[in-house]
From Swiss-Prot:
GO terms for biological process: plant epidermis development; proteolysis. Its main location: secreted. The active site is at D174 (charge relay system), H252 (charge relay system), S618 (charge relay system). It holds the Pfam family fn3_6. It comes from Arabidopsis thaliana (Mouse-ear cress). Residues 150-690 form the Peptidase S8 domain. Its EC number is 3.4.21.-. This is Subtilisin-like protease SBT2.4. The lineage of its organism: Eukaryota, Viridiplantae, Streptophyta, Embryophyta, Tracheophyta. Changing G230E: In ale1-2; Seedlings lethality when homozygous due to water loss. Mutant seedling grown under high humidity can survive and show small, crinkled cotyledons and fused leaves. PANTHER family: PROPROTEIN CONVERTASE SUBTILISIN/KEXIN (PTHR10795).
Amino acid sequence: METNPRKLRSYSYICLIVCIFVLVVCAILSRAEEKEGKGENDDHIPKIYSILVEGEPLAFRASTNINSKAMALEAKKIEEIHDEILGSTLEKGSYTKLYSFKHVINAIAVRTTASQAKKLGKTKGVKAVEEDKGVKLMTTYTPDFLELPQQVWQKISNEGDRRAGEDIVIGFVDTGINPTHPSFAALDLTNPYSSNLSRLHFSGDCEIGPFFPPGSCNGKIISARFFSAGARASGALNSSLDILSPFDASGHGSHVASIAAGNAGVPVIVDGFFYGRASGMAPRSRIAVYKAIYPSIGTLVDVIAAIDQAIMDGVDVLTLSVGPDEPPVDKPTVLGIFDLAMLLARKAGVFVVQAVGNNGPSPSSVLSYSPWVVGVAAGNTDRSYPAPLILDGGQTVQGVGLSGPTLGAPLVQHRLVLAKDAVRTNGSVLQPLTRDIEECQRPENFDPAAVFGSIVICTFSDGFYNQMSTVLAITQTARTLGFMGFILIANPRFGDYVAEPVIFSAPGILIPTVSAAQIILRYYEEKTFRDTRGVATQFGARARIGEGRNSVFAGKAPVVSRFSSRGPAFIDATRSPLDVLKPDILAPGHQIWGAWSLPSAFDPILTGRSFAILSGTSMATPHIAGIGALIKQLNPSWTPAMIASAISTTANEYDSNGEIISAEYYELSRLFPSNHFDHGAGHVNPARALDPGLVLPAGFEDYISFLCSLPNISPATIRDATGVLCTTTLSHPANLNHPSVTISALKESLVVRRSFQDVSNKTETYLGSVLPPNGTTVRLTPTWFTVPPQKTQDLDIEFNVTQVLNKFTFGEVVLTGSLNHIIRIPLSVKTI
């Protein structure tokens, strides 16, 4: 018998490997069986689906009176067809109909199982079935930053903000509105709103309910509805949070509405501190509310129902600071039901504005795809709220936090205590150091005598990254134990973190950079005495927190915000680039003040406050909605495409220093030159957008031709989605008459055409120039032209590949007019 120890160890090792291999295989097989079993059981879990049905919706039928008896009969017929489709296809008791969409889209929302939805997909009269993926939510200074009082409101009326936005209705699909907020009051008896809504070509309704009593629709708010069938069907509604009325329990919808349409000159006072006066972009515009998002749940079918109703009511502008959680996986992005609803809104003459999302700075992170909607990116202004921590000895460390100074400032310094040095002990036994101690999450962790009257240093750790820890918990701990103040420093193990100004009820500062945190910790250790066990026995470090509520205006602006989603837009689940520029435009979206709602269900730290400072593309979007309303007011005959063109072609691509707009990326301390996939056409310039000189018109038929020209999408698919045949196609998708040119795969050469319409009242001569994207040459034909008022002029743009780069590069066409109009057309090209 072999007894060599080395060989025995070898055999044992082989046996061990075999055993591990067998266990791993068994685990994989078990996991696969479990997954397969779950897949089979998933069919018993009802989900929400949107069913696109053949037939034209009511808004696009011959009759123009949507409220006539004839149209009411047509609406009834459509609903009967919907019921027949469901009743004849699905098993009794296997479904719940949530909505019959009849106005701008012909569709059904239904809750049923996957197998039943599959049956519907094969039913005659059904064009498409789409599973509901859910939806998510995507100023005292910005009117001045955009020069509205000086350059825009006075051009519209010599009464300025008293008429800016007059008779324009902006619709908001969001979380509702706080009807008692002063931003939405109608108390100016010297400038009352007309009660005659017929002259606005608008017909809405005011649905009363909890916290939304009669009288909530006051002339400023002219319509308010809520949509909850999808939310109810999801089973996720929380009766204590999700108020079934147009009332905004979260604050988001009120914030968005105030940015676009809030009253002018509203004092922003929080915790007794005056931050300035707020105004919407179009302060005299009317507000129509369509609540479709709740604190606990948001479903796409509720959003579609809200869009459908908004178009029927007759809004001029539609603001969508919401969007699907993710793109459709089984169809082109531009043919998802959300994008189709926006296409039909555009067909109805509504200017639609959509947030591109907050998934930046990753490429192809936009959730806006289609050329018929304006996708808005978010930028920083030059306003900031620095919060200083002044160490004993005079060194100042800058942080972030909207709070007042510590008691006795600027003369009195207070003891600094690191949270882990103030842990409650059990006799001589030290409490084990845990994450929630470092993060100051629970008052019972601390020795009250050590922290009372002290500035406590808390550490940003993994609890904040996994959302188990909150700044609110720190403030509650501070209040319970009587902290003089607190600091939340970056953790060297995790690196820098992103900090936004937060309104603190007690003095507090966020220190988001490791370098600044190390300055504080180094000073602290120099002044702290420890015993042989490392336990702090004497705290010698002193500091004070300075005033953090005063704004400072400095630095370059605008800058593309880190969170703002980036292009290119894509057409399918593989993220193949789409020949459409997204985002379209950049607008202020960082640290924006706006109205809030007292319950603040989304953010408890803001509970009880009437104003909030927030960041997001949700905040950028209403800026463009309000500016669109001003353009519509000045040019009531303009189509949505003309308004979008005016905003795009007049945008600024340079910042306050005269340099190309910069963008934030992953590194907190650095800025990088931005490109069209960061900022779109550039930062909105409202004054120039009011008088663009030339615009690029496009209509519903043009968008259908664009769809029909997209590769790998059959005419049948287009017909099923839109109800329109592909009678004409473009030679290339980039030939859509759009205020930008995006070519996702340029081989050898391509000529695209743009058709401009003069919208001034004087003949003007334009001279063309080109900054070609790298790897191309670009030629214009003609190189100059003269166009009379209201006439059109075609421009051919010829691209030739000089180098295959297999990546997007960027340039622009510039048309300089003899009457000082300047039109910029962004170019984004990938040579292959």
